[in-house]
């Protein structure tokens, strides 16, 4: 009898594993990967842009820090509004389907998504800040930022692909090309504008 109960418990655990709702995981993964990539690329691009016209490390770091704070706040607010809108839609849908009853534990939390997005953005933004903080030579600093951002993009791209069960190589190529383009365009345009004294 006891062995039958054990078998029943094992079967129930297997059923729970096979019926696991991956939509929550996808929501968190999307917010975390987007936040980290955005923090990494936007802060690095901002620092590279300022670096194109001002070689002072202090100005570059202050600009990067301002970008970190503004970006983390923006990501948190945007994610909160987005997830709250989704939450409202899903609650209304559940009420229509079940006659007024809702199972709110299945729904994503807007506050948690906002916090996760802000933390992920901050984590990404810290990479170029730390890379630039200890290098005084301008050209070396730019090279170190690009190298650190490239390494972080590879890590974030790989992690996102593995957790999301997506093709790793395609994910890495997309992430790397996007990051490099953003930094190159920002640097180039700022250099162009700065050289004309605007």
UniProtKB/Swiss-Prot annotation:
A biological-process GO annotation: iron ion transport
Entry superkingdom: Eukaryota
Sequence ranges on the Vacuolar membrane side: 54-60, 136-141, 196-198
InterPro entries registered for this protein in UniProt: Ccc1_fam
Localization: Vacuole membrane
Name of the protein this chain belongs to: Vacuolar iron transporter homolog 4
Purpose of the protein: Probable vacuolar iron transporter that may be involved in the regulation of iron distribution throughout the plant.
Species classification: Eukaryota, Viridiplantae, Streptophyta, Embryophyta, Tracheophyta
Main location: membrane
Topology with respect to the bilayer: Multi-pass membrane protein
Family under the similarity heading: Belongs to the CCC1 family.
